[in-house]
Design a protein with these regions (language model features):
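Amphipathic alpha-helical packing segments from all-alpha helical-bundle domains
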Residues: 100, 106-107, 152-174
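Generic hydrophobic, amphipathic alpha-helix propensity
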Residues: 44-53, 69, 94-98, 102, ...
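Hydrophobic alpha-helical connector segments
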Residues: 93, 107-135
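N-terminal intrinsically disordered/low-complexity leader segments
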Residues: 1-43
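Short, structured helix-loop boundary elements
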Residues: 45-46, 66, 88, 92, ...
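Helix-turn-helix
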Residues: 47, 55-89, 93
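Amphipathic alpha-helical segments used for helix-helix packing
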Residues: 132-158
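Solvent-exposed, amphipathic alpha-helical segments
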Residues: 51-58, 105-109
Length: 174
């Protein structure tokens, strides 16, 4: 039974061939092929990012433009472009924020919860990734909506899937 659940999760989260990109630790970000330190955002920027995450989550990436984000965040367009430079960069940052939060939850479930049986951990992981109001939904939505229009941001979503697959592989080897 556990192998069936695991196989189902791997099928669900496996990237297509040729898109594999392994990350050695869960908290590293990559931008233009270079390693970046952990994402640290000022308070006002974080407010804009959280507002954009909410808008993208409920309306989609293509229906929400810079004008709507600026209006909802109550900042000027100049401030927006000073913070993010482009909508693609904002989407990429939003996905990085969601990815890091999700990775923290997965690591907490898998590595630190030693009293829970493996099958229950898999069920929790499944529930975490199928919750439409959860952290994974934006990453999942990005896979289908932004592949052609925002390829750098798309790679962020794909790196999470690759990380999750690697995490399962390492967990099985132990």
């Amino acid at each position: 039974m556990p192998s069936t659940v695991f196989t189902a999760l791997l099928c669900l989260f496996s990237p297509k061939k040729g898109t594999g990109f392994f990350i050695s630790t869960y908290n590293k970000n990559f931008y233009n092929g270079k390693t970046m330190p952990n994402l640290v955002l000022p308070t006002r920027t974080l407010y804009v990012v959280n507002k954009a995450i909410d808008l993208f989550h409920h309306r989609g990436f293509h229906l929400i433009g810079v004008d709507r984000i600026v209006k909802e965040s109550e900042i000027t367009k100049a401030t927006f472009y000073n913070y993010f430079h482009s909508k693609e960069r904002l989407i990429e940052i939003c996905l990085m924020v969601q990815k890091e939060k999700l990775q923290e939850q997965v690591v907490a479930m898998v590595e630190y919860d030693l009293s829970t049986p493996t099958i229950d951990k898999l069920k929790k992981l499944y529930d975490l990734h199928t919750d439409l109001e959860g952290l994974y939904y934006l990453l999942f939505k990005a896979i289908f909506e932004i592949k052609n229009s925002y390829p750098k941001a798309y790679q962020t979503a794909m790196r999470y899937r690759t990380w999750l697959k690697m995490k399962f592989t390492v967990s099985l080897e132990c």
